[in-house]
Amino acid sequence: MRSLALAEELVRRGAEVVFVCDSHTVPWADEQIRGRGIAVEPAVWTAEQHLELFGRLGLTAVVWDSYDLDPAVFAAVRASGLPSLAIVDGGYGGAVADILVDQNLGSELDSPELPEGAIRLAGLDYVLLRNEILELRPAEPPAPRSGGVPKVFAFFGGTDAFGAGPYVVQALAATGVPFEALVIAPGDELAEAIGAVHLQPGQHVEVIGPTSQLAKAVVASDLVISASGTSTWELLCLGATAGLVCVVDNQVMGYERTVATGAAVGVGVLSDLKADPSAAAAVLGPLLQDPAERARLAAAGWQLVDGQGRVRVADHLFELLARTT
């Protein structure tokens, strides 16, 4: 999604963009790319294949966003003189580029050694967000919405690969507090597991499949529960009251950093929720009953992520092109 967000900004400025990837293996991602009229070329893997493809396409610049490529690919393309930008997470994973973008919280505090001549854009000022997020960003922090049963929206990526949905619904049910929840379940097995959760009086859960209307569902909700990760920045930009679940144990540090900002609530680590939902219920219960606290969290997130990250990144890329072409 972050590459798609930057692509949208580049297209907005008049650039022609092509994705080189195996998007057909993830249908919802393929739909997102092609639905914007962006061309797709099949993925290639070796340095020689990349140089041949980039020459055939007549590229002016390349943007990398990959954990799988051999470091030799990055080095060979940069050595060819083609201006390059790489989106990275912490360690560069072998990525060599003229511009390195690390949009992770706290990354601006790190001082890694850079490739010769490279610059680094780090922190939430460079978060890359899609049009559908920016179009729905409120002009002001959301005001408290009191009265009525709170509306909850829960989603965990395109596939919910770790099966978080049923356990989050168990935690919500364990609060005993009335709510109306919309939960995304990408498969029948997950949907059945969610439907099997015993609910208390006044609690209602609707299960749907993957949707392209995530942002609209977010802004229509009083509480959004999602996996801690890059989608968190979308929630904060939209002024959502965000409850985060750490779905992978080795991501606890990033999860804790985000919660420590005061702009989101930590629902818990998924392995803990699976063992016992009571701790998560103790977090969610008060939040469901306190519109003022939900509004405070929403305002903090709205201020933390201003939605202009892709503009700043594109500015640097076009400045690079102006110097090198």
Can you name each region flagged by the protein language model?
Residues R2-V11, V20-E116, R120:
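Active-site and donor-binding regions of nucleotide-sugar-utilizing enzymes
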Residues V96-G163, I184, A191:
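A nucleotide-sugar donor-handling region in carbohydrate enzymes
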Residues P138-D222:
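Donor-nucleotide binding loops and adjacent catalytic segments primarily
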Residues A215, T232-L238, E256:
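Short alpha-helical segment that forms part of, or immediately flanks, the ligand-binding pocket
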Residues V219-T230, A240:
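Acidic donor-binding loop of glycosyltransferase active sites
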Residues E293-G307:
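A short, well-ordered alpha-helix in the C-terminal region of glycosyltransferases
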Residues D306-T325:
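C-terminal alpha-helical cap of glycosyltransferases
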